[in-house]
Structures are given as C-alpha cells and as structure tokens.
Amino acid sequence: MGRLFGTSGIRMKNLSPKIAYKVGLAVAKKYKKVVVGRDTRTTGKLIETALTAGILNGGGEVTTINIVPTPVLGFNARNYDVGIMITASHNPPEYNGIKLFNKNGLAFNKKEEDEIEEIIFKEDFIEVEWHSVGEIWEDSRAIRNYMEHILKNVEINEKFNVVIDCANASACLVSPYLFTDLGCHVISVNSHMDGRFIGRLPEPDEKNLKKTMDMIKGLNMSGDNYIGIAHDGDADRMVAIDEKGRLADFDKLLAAFSRYMVEKTGNKKIVTTVDASMIIDEYLKDLDVEIIRTKVGDVAVAEEMIKNSAVFGGEPSGTWIHADIHLTPDGILSGLRVLEMLDFYNKKLYEILDEIPSYVNLREKIPCEDDKKEKVMSYVIENGESLFKTVPETVDGARFNLENGWVLIRPSGTEPYIRVRVEAKNNKDAKELLEKGIKLVKEALSAL
C-alpha cells in the first residue's frame, strides 16, 4: 500500500470516512487531547464525524471548533496535544484531506506522519471499552482567541482600501473582520461560505481571480487605490492584487516582503524553498542576507526557521510563516503584513514590485508512476551533472544552479509526475534549459 500522507497531510478525491475513522483511532493511540476544525467543503462534516468517532473510540477527547481557517486551528492547537484540520486547501471541491499539527502549531513532519501511518496500515488500534470512551466538547472562542492575538501584534497606520476575496471558504469568518478592525475600508467578495466554491475555485490563480482583478481595476479608475488580497480554500495562503488590477508576481512579492522583514527586524536569515526564484537572492544581496533553501512544503520551511532562528519564511505560492506570531502558515496574517510593508515604505504595491526585475519561469510535468520516482531521480542526479556541468543541490529533488539560470527536477509529492521547473533571464535560455530538463527525465524513464 502506498503512503497516505503527501507533502501536505492526507489529501485525496472523495476522501472516505473509513480512512478518517482509522486516522482518528491512530491519533488517539498517541494523543489524548485533540482539537478539530474543518473548512467549508460539503464532505467536511462527514469526515469530521468519522474522525471524531475514531478518536473517541480510541479513548481520546475531542474539542471541535467547527468551520475555521487553518491558521486558526494551528494557533489553537497550543492548548491541546494535537490539532487536526479537515481541508484540501486549494484543491477542487470534490477533494478533502486531513492535516495534523503539533501543539506548537507546526504541521506534522514525515517522522510524525509515519508513526500515525504505521498504526493505520498495521491496524494496531486500541478500541476502548464503553466506560472509557472519550468526550466531545465545543469551543466557540477559537476564532476570537486568534483574532485578539493578531490584533495585538499587527499595526497599520494607513487607512487602506482593500478588496478581500474569500473564495466562499473559511476566510469569510475572519479576514474581512480583521482588516476592518485594523482600520481598512473593506469590500469583500465571494464572502458567503459555500463548500461548492460557487464564486470561484479555491486555487487563487490568475484565471480564477479574473473577476476580482477586473473589479479592482474598475474601482481604481476613479482613483480609489484599492489593492486585493485573495485566499485559497483554508486561508493558509494569500495572493495579492496590485492597484493596477494585476496579480502580484509570487516571487517578487516574496522577495519584497523578505526585504521588508530584514529591514524591520534586523534578522538577516530568510527561509524559502528550492523552487523559489533567484530574484530573492539578487534583491536582498546588498543587505548581506542568508537565504536558506529547504524542501518544498511548509513543514520543511518552519523547521528550518526554528533551526536558524529566522523570523520569516515562505514559499512562492503565498504560503508564508511568521515565527514571531505562530508557526502555522497564515494567509490572513500575511495579507495584513503586506499592508504593514506598504505602510513602512509609504509606497503603493505596484511601485515596489515594478522595481524588481522580471525573469522567465517555465515548467513542465512528466507522467511518472510513484514507484518509479526514486530510480528516475537517481538517474537525474547521476547524469545531470555532466549535462549541466554542475553538481546539483539535492535538498529536494535536484537543482542545477547555472550562470544563466537554474533547473529544478523533483518528484511531485501529491501526483504521479516528475516536475521540471527552470528560470533564466531571457526566453531563449529558459526554453533551452527546459528542453534539457525534460530530455533528461525522459531518458531516465527509458532507462528503467
């Protein structure tokens, strides 16, 4: 049987309540006090009920906080042995998932997930007698506790005009209210909860955000200076839309915010992932910042932040972690801190981003069965050195850093693909690097 856990917990199409029940039993064998939250998906209550039944039947206690954003669950996990979020994040509505957090608000790492997975696969459960069945509680203050903590730690002096796109998801319960409490004039869209995501799909990309982007462009024709903040299905991510109605380039925004955090805090360590652009290295070069690259995934970023005492770490996708507040990826807090950055520099978002150079990014995914990925990557590492004339970094897959750009070849953690991503300063170089990367992977597959 393959792994249940991928790069972001358990996530699958038509997640079965049978799996959720077994996860609950496995969790209860190791942890007794559990807090559970869910996003707006139509299967959320079903999965929560099955998961809770497993925990109770294993002798654990459950506190439900109902529909909440993932950062609210992660923040409240500090009061329990473990937190469990039922969400498939940015995936379409037919998907659901289960993500576990420790009491520091840090998502489970591979070792912790493996322990739960082993119990499930061996069916090494303990089902208690009737007199030892656990109890279930409800905490109605979970969102308020989180909001009060954020309000104490974020300060925005400027009165910003903000369009917030909540994706018909759990951000509806928090994001518009926090921004308003901090003095913003807020227009919220897709702000009623609907697990079918009828306003737009939960992936906050350019296609799904077109209406919101056009709305901001129209509002600003009259000089209103709105910017946009959009969330995914569980609000652990954030993307920004500038005053011209353009989706902010993910890598540029990450670089700009990283620079702001260095200048504000004096902490010169920034953690990001192997797939992040070389923009961040070049934009922060004059500040003598150490850029620490990790495997893709918020767990790897958070663990490296702890290890290096970094204040900020993030992925280009908009999954950002603010260690001075908590260790759960937080799209709501990230949106507020983008406004803090604009306040700090007294500039518009487009002015900051347009100062940063643009590079060419290309990517491709090549079908590869999960049981072949390890052999393919061994071939890539062994033969890529002679092809690219450089020794690859192998933090996550193989990254070849070159004079004219870089090539990253890595196995997907959630799908049967090998992903190839390249970056260069012009189209010609980027296309050549992509062709080389694809050719190398196909050679590896042919050699099996």
UniProtKB/Swiss-Prot annotation:
The entry's keywords: Isomerase, Magnesium, Metal-binding, Phosphoprotein
MF terms in GO: magnesium ion binding; phosphoglucosamine mutase activity; phosphomannomutase activity
Cofactor annotation: Mg(2+)
InterPro entries xref list: A-D-PHexomutase_a/b/a-I, A-D-PHexomutase_a/b/a-I/II/III, A-D-PHexomutase_a/b/a-II, A-D-PHexomutase_a/b/a-III, A-D-PHexomutase_C, A-D-PHexomutase_C_sf, A-D-PHexomutase_CS, Alpha-D-phosphohexomutase_SF
A GO BP annotation: carbohydrate metabolic process
Residues annotated as the enzyme's active site: S89
Subunit and partners: Forms large aggregates.
HAMAP family linked: GlmM_A
Enzyme Commission number(s): 5.4.2.10
UniProt key word Ligase: no
Annotated TM spans: none
Cofactor: how bound: Binds 1 Mg(2+) ion per subunit.
Class of enzymatic activity (EC top level): isomerase
Record PTM Phosphoserine, positions in chain: S89
Binding site for Mg(2+): S89, D232, D234, D236
Cell membrane recorded as keyword: no
Name of the featured protein: Phosphoglucosamine mutase
NCBIfam families in UniProt: Arch_GlmM
